[in-house]
A protein has these predicted regions:
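Transmembrane alpha-helices of multi-pass inner-membrane enzymes
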Residues: 17-31, 39-57, 241, 423-474
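N-terminal signal-anchor transmembrane segment
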Residues: 3-125, 152-156, 431
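Long extracytoplasmic/lumenal interhelical loops at the membrane interface
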Residues: 316-339, 343-347, 351-386, 407-410
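Interfacial loop-to-transmembrane-helix boundary motif in multi-pass membrane proteins
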Residues: 64-82, 132-148, 158-171, 179-206
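Alpha-helical transmembrane segments of multi-pass inner-membrane proteins
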Residues: 2, 12-28, 116-124, 144-155, ...
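Hydrophobic transmembrane alpha-helices and their immediate junctions
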Residues: 11-13, 182, 296-297, 388-429, ...
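A membrane-periplasm/extracellular boundary helix in multi-pass inner-membrane enzymes
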Residues: 27-39, 206-215, 264, 268-269, ...
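Structural signal for the C-terminal ends of transmembrane alpha-helices
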Residues: 52-66, 121-133, 179-188, 243-250, ...
Length: 474
């Protein structure tokens, strides 16, 4: 097993970080942006304090347990990974497309960017030279290439500041995944990765639902849970699969509660792609285990719960309205959006319009519906923003995940390895289906896209362990 070593004196490394932090703080105080002394600033400070407190607690527990260096780095990296997953929910806001295009961002947006910088600082404290050498080895190179492409293309988008900020988050997420790739050595490490993702999606699913129920203007908006119903259905469906996977591994009965909560939120949100993907992915989770009775039980439970929700909430009015307006034929206007954006794609087919240029489709593309926000398809999202280069890299990531998981599923019958491969496959199908109708991948470094990129690392590790076990049995 490879170990990570320190190539420079610790005092020099830490001193450089302190000097950099001091310089950035001085520049920030000199600029005196209006949000500096607002409530958002205190939120950033508070969240940063929580992050470093968690890192301290995890580090202290590792010393007491006598863990090896690789596991220590992995646990610390997963804390930062979790913090990055939930950052959008901590700094929740809704900025109209026109305001973003004009460069008018909310204080919460600046706060979230500052929080990413805090997470990056935490990562810098863990960086070791040998870990960075793996950035362009194996499957990691596809992650690194996509992140670098987005970073390079960001200045060419209609709003470079917006695109650069999100490219920075994507770059940070890839750095964390490279560190995870360098430190994941067994099935327990992969399970730890999914525990980190689980607690992230708990926040991403439960907090928006609670926010909707305390919303003074009403719990429902046009028949669906108030907020971002498409995103919420996706996150809740992902939570269900993660809870089922971890419960299968560890038999934690309380995880069943999160399955129920996740399924309820998934249906109440009314995101049609999210509901279909959630039902299909859980069904696949049981089918791959040949648990046909569980398949029928799951489908029956969804049918009963869905019926209760339709009777007890205004959700039925949303589906009735959807049918009356004949939106099924255009997938809620998506096909019309794709047709309208296609000429723009052909203008720059190789390099695209710049990372996250699709955020402003309604401002640039004639025929795009208002507040489109993205291409509503992950592959078209990459094609519009980063051209064929970005699309090829994204397709390569998908193909490698499928190839790795297929090999892991066909490998030796180690129970936990099989469950992790089955769970990873179900999560992938959930994200894949959603991404056909939303920008689940290929665009912003949101939690679902981060999880998809993480599946590339996990699937490669599962395949490597499968190949190793297969070699030992011959």
């Amino acid at each position: 097993m490879k170990t990570l070593t320190i190539a420079t004196p610790a005092y020099l490394h830490n001193g450089l970080l302190v000097a950099t932090l001091a310089a950035l703080s001085f520049l920030l105080l000199a600029a005196r942006p209006p949000w500096l002394f607002s409530g958002v600033t205190f939120t950033v400070i508070g969240c940063g304090g929580v992050l470093f407190a968690l890192l301290f607690v995890v580090s202290a527990s590792q010393r007491s347990q006598g863990l090896d260096l690789a596991k220590s780095y992995l646990r610390l990296a997963l804390v930062v990974w979790w913090a990055l997953l939930i950052s959008e929910e901590v700094f929740y806001r809704h900025t109209p497309e026109a305001e973003s295009f004009a460069g008018h961002f909310s204080e919460a947006a600046y706060g979230e960017a500052a929080y990413w910088a805090v997470a990056f600082l935490a990562l810098l404290l863990m960086i070791r030279p040998q870990y960075l050498r793996q950035a362009f080895s194996g499957s990691n190179k596809w992650l690194a290439l996509f992140a670098l492409l987005c970073l390079i293309s960001a200045p060419f988008s209609p709003t470079p500041l917006y695109s650069l900020a999100w490219a920075f988050k994507l770059f940070l997420a890839v750095l964390l995944l490279v560190l995870c790739s360098a430190t994941i050595n067994d099935l327990d490490d992969i399970e730890s990765f999914f525990w980190s993702a689980f607690w992230g999606f708990v926040i991403l699913s439960v907090v928006p639902a609670v926010r909707a129920f305390v919303n003074p203007s009403g719990v429902f908006d046009k028949g669906r849970l108030w907020g971002s119903p498409n995103d919420l259905s996706l996150c809740a469906g992902t939570l269900v699969v993660l809870a089922l996977l971890l419960n299968s591994l560890r038999k934690r009965t309380w995880l069943v509660g999160f399955v129920i909560v996740g399924t309820t939120v998934m249906i109440m949100s009314g995101g049609k792609a999210g509901i279909i993907a959630g039902i299909a992915s859980v069904t696949l989770f049981y089918v791959l285990q040949k648990r046909l009775a569980a398949v029928f039980g799951w489908l029956l439970a969804v049918l009963v719960l869905g019926g209760i929700i339709l009777l007890a909430t205004p959700l039925a009015t949303h589906f009735i309205s959807y049918q009356e307006r004949d939106q099924l034929s255009t997938f809620t206007g998506r096909t019309e959006l794709w047709k309208a954006a296609w000429p723009d794609i052909l203008q720059r087919p190789i390099v695209g319009h710049g990372y996250l240029a699709s955020r402003f489709l309604s401002e640039h593309v004639e025929g795009a519906f208002g507040e489109a926000g993205h291409m509503h398809n992950g592959f078209l999202e990459a094609l519009y923003n980063n051209g064929l280069i970005g699309l090829i890299i994204l397709v390569a990531i998908h193909l490698l995940i499928v190839k790795n998981l297929w090999r892991a599923l066909k490998g030796p019958r180690d129970r936990n390895a099989q469950l992790l491969a089955v769970g990873s496959s179900a999560i992938y199908v959930n994200l894949l289906i959603n991404g056909l109708f939303n920008a689940t991948y290929g665009g912003r470094a949101s939690a679902p896209f981060m999880l998809l990129l993480g599946l590339l690392v996990v699937s490669e590790k599962l395949r490597g362990m499968t190949d190793q076990s297969d070699g030992l049995t011959r």
